[in-house]
C-alpha cells in the first residue's frame, strides 16, 4: 500500500484521539485539524488584473496544545497536493502537472513547527515548510479566534487564522516561460508572490456522541462476559453476538475510546491489542493504541508503537507529534 493511499485513508477514517484528559498529567492536549471546517487556501495575481484563488481539500494536522504554556505547543500538517482546486478543471490539471506542482513527483506539502511564541496580536509559529521538494524555514503569524470551547455536540474545538506570503519561485514552482513573462511593467502573467490563507479548526471529539452499532455491541459483550473472553472469541472468529462477528477498525475505536473515557483503561487496552493483532496495517488503530499507552504513562510501549506507525505511514502527523512529545520527556 502506498503512503499516499494510507494518508487519504487516515484523513477520512480517523477522528482525533478523544481521551485527552485521561491519564498522566503534564501531557499536552491532542487536537486534530477538522478539515471539514478548516481551509488551506491560496491566491495568486493573474495578468496583473485579477486574483486566482484556490484551496487544498485533503490534509491532516495534529496540534499538541499546552494551554498553560502555549510556547510549548507544536503542530504538524501534511497536505495532499493533488487535492488542489481553483474551480476550473483544466486549470487544476495544469497546476497538478510537472509545469507547476508536479503532484506525482511531490505528492505532499508539509509543515512541522519548531517553536511557538506570542506576538502582539496572537502567535507566531516558526517551522520547516516543504513544498515541491524544497524545505525552507517559515514564520507564520496566527490569531486565535477562539480558545478551546465546547461546540453543540460537546466536542472541544479551537480555531486559528493565519496569513502569509511566499514566493513560488523560491520553491521551484516555475511554469513555462509564458507564465513568467511581463506584459507591461509590473504586470506578470502569474505573479511570483502567493498569498496563503489558513483557517484552522481543531477538535477533540466527544466520544459519547459517536454512533456505531457494532462498537456499542462490543461494549455490551465486554460488560456481559469480560474483555478477555470477548477478545478471545473475536480472535477465534466465533462470537455469541452476530453484531460483532465482522467489525471494522472504527468499531474497535468506538468501544475502546468509550471504555477509556469511563476510566476502564485496562479494558480499552485489551480491545486495542486484539484490534491491532487482527488488523495490523490499520494506522488508525496503531495511533490510538499508542496514545492510550502514552496517557497511561507507558512511554516505552507508546514510543515503540508510534515508531511502528511512522514506518507504516510516513505522513502520519499523529506519529510525528507524539514522538516529539514523548522524546522530550
Residue ranges and their predicted role:
Residues 254, 288, 321-322:
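Canonical tetratricopeptide repeat
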Residues 21-217:
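Low-complexity, acidic/polar, glycine-enriched regions of mature
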Residues 249, 283-284, 317:
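Helix-start (N-cap) detector for alpha-helical repeat units in TPR-like alpha-solenoids
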